[in-house]
Amino acid sequence: MSMSRGSVCRRCLLTMKSMAGGGPTSTYAQQRGKKTWHGPKYQAKIDQAQADWEERAEKIKKGEIQHTWDMFVERGYVKDTAGSHETIRKLMLHKRIGAYTGIDPTAPSLHIGHLLPLMPIFWMYMHGYAGYTLIGGATAKIGDPTDRLVSRTPLKRTDLTMNLTKIHYQLKALWMNVEEQARRRGFEKDWAWKRAVVNNSTWWNSLPLIEVLKRLGDSMRMGPLLSRDTVKNKMSKGDGMSFSEFTYPLMQGWDWWHMYQANGIQMQIGGSDQYGNIVTGVETVKVVRDNEPDPAKKIEGGPFNDPVGFTVPLLTDSAGVKFGKSAGNAFLDKFQTSEFDLYGYFVRRSDQEVEKLLKLFTFLPMENINEAMKIHSENPARRVAQHLLAFEVVGLVHGMNAAHRTALNHQARYGKQIDIPGVTLRMPKAATEDTPPSILDAPKMDMQLPESLIMGKSIGRILYAAGLAKSASEGHRLATQQGAYIGAMPGHKRTEDNKVMDYSQLSFTPIKLWFPQETRNYLIDGKLLILRKGKVQIRVIEMVSDEEWKESGQTYPGEPGTGALRMLRQQLKMLKSGMLTPDEVKANLKNHVEEEAPPPGFMKFPDQDSYAIRRATQELMDEIHQKEVGGDSPREERRE
């Protein structure tokens, strides 16, 4: 029986063509043992990527280029493995697998310790594998009990939202810097490179419990789970273990399964304490995979489809203290650990540990590291290797402009010439890149704004007050042009009330011109507002009562009585006291007028200013005139 093309829908037609062998097979479809169809252009990219991968494998076999796994071992990234070295090596040679590492947002910033398991992910991405970073928005509500005798204090909902938002954008910034580092080191990005920052709340918030229990619970035996050291120690020596803590490694394993079947993530990389969770995760993925009830969706097992993983070593400094903890943690948030302090932290590393840190925390080729250590050994007092380490780490965490600027600032402060092998220090080209960060640039929840502003003023004024716009009119334009975004639950409607806001699953929706009272629909837990402009300019704002705001003594841009009027009165006071000359006051006024200039096509009439501002302006101009010509004030002359 034949069918005409018009008698079936497009989806069925594609399915029939695929089943008939008329279409190619994707990477994940091969893993599942079924075919999917792609268009000819997309298929050409897949074919080229596969050909490039096979060519790369041949070069590795011939010894022309180094195997990525061998590089991991050489640089010291590998501690314990789930799967043998040879199995992992063969898998990475023949298959473009994906790898991930997970981070629970239990604190508002990543620290140097988090960077170590991220480095192999970054390396794999540069070598053509998929690199994923997972934020545990769901698992953070439970808390990882590994190596703990006392349960974690539950996070407040607003704290979790703040932590999740800040870490998400720290990871995005890190990935942008990784792209920059790849270009520096001569890696040519191709179509097959894949990376992502994901949040496990995305699937846990819609996952039926019965599916987890049926596909996972039936086959996971209690004996092995109870025999884990974490469980035994917490139950015998600690405060006991809750059921939610007991299921934490299973939740982590399900995360892996979700990315395994959806994205081909076959490897997990974790910190030195995560080996037990990785082993449980391997077992979880296999169990859920084998319990797939739909034969069409079932993924075959075998060495080339089984999950693998490894842990990175525990780093300690020369004093035996856990790395990053010796003098307070070295945070990746520049408002908790400044670029200068982070640079200084690595400059202070001992000669005994600097070579190991260069291998672990930089993308420098081994020959460059060996050459730097040779130069360093000739005169250790110059700390050449330490400066190279500090420069590279700051470049990875904050970008290369920050690395150059910080090294030059360090040189200027201590008056010593800095020699960094292979680097010619330069000042950043753009003037704005040399400007110290403002507190308004920090995505901190202690950025507070009063309730009267959040609930009673336009969104344009809120953007101005939050430092995302230079004026209220610019904030208005951002809202009109949908150039700024507000934190909301995926699919959130402005007509809904704030009860639908989920504090562990956040997306951003474009800001529009809405009524002031509608801003309340975006408050998280009734007091937290998250705004964004561009890719990484984030404001996490806590709404406080007007009384609390007044007592704090803070002001915000555009606050009544604190803007132009305050500036005019300050200028008048300083002019009368002789602290400023008339010319300096004029220059300040000119700069202020330029900053507050209306947008093109918008006419601002003088009488739109308040009477107090017009009067203060006149008083200031009279005082300038008096200072310039001397004698009585113009007002007194006119009265006479």
UniProtKB/Swiss-Prot annotation:
Keywords: Aminoacyl-tRNA synthetase, ATP-binding, Ligase, Mitochondrion, mRNA processing, Nucleotide-binding, Protein biosynthesis, Transit peptide. Its main location: mitochondrion. It is found in: Mitochondrion matrix. ATP binds at D104, K325. L-tyrosine binds at Y100, D144, Y248, Q252, D255, Q274. Disulfide bonds: none annotated. Its EC number is 6.1.1.1. Pfam families: tRNA-synt_1b, TyrRSs_C. Gene3D superfamilies: HUPs, RNA-binding S4 domain, Tyrosyl-Transfer RNA Synthetase. GO terms for molecular function: ATP binding; RNA binding; tyrosine-tRNA ligase activity. A motif ('HIGH' region) lies at residues 105-114. InterPro entries: aa-tRNA-synth_I_CS, aa-tRNA-synth_Ic, Rossmann-like_a/b/a_fold, S4_RNA-bd_sf, Tyr-tRNA-ligase, Tyr-tRNA-ligase_bac-type, TyrRSs_C. One of its GO terms (cellular component) is mitochondrial matrix. GO terms for biological process: mRNA processing; tyrosyl-tRNA aminoacylation. Has both an aminoacyl-tRNA synthetase activity and is involved in the splicing of group I introns. Belongs to the class-I aminoacyl-tRNA synthetase family. This is Tyrosine--tRNA ligase, mitochondrial. The gene is YTS1.
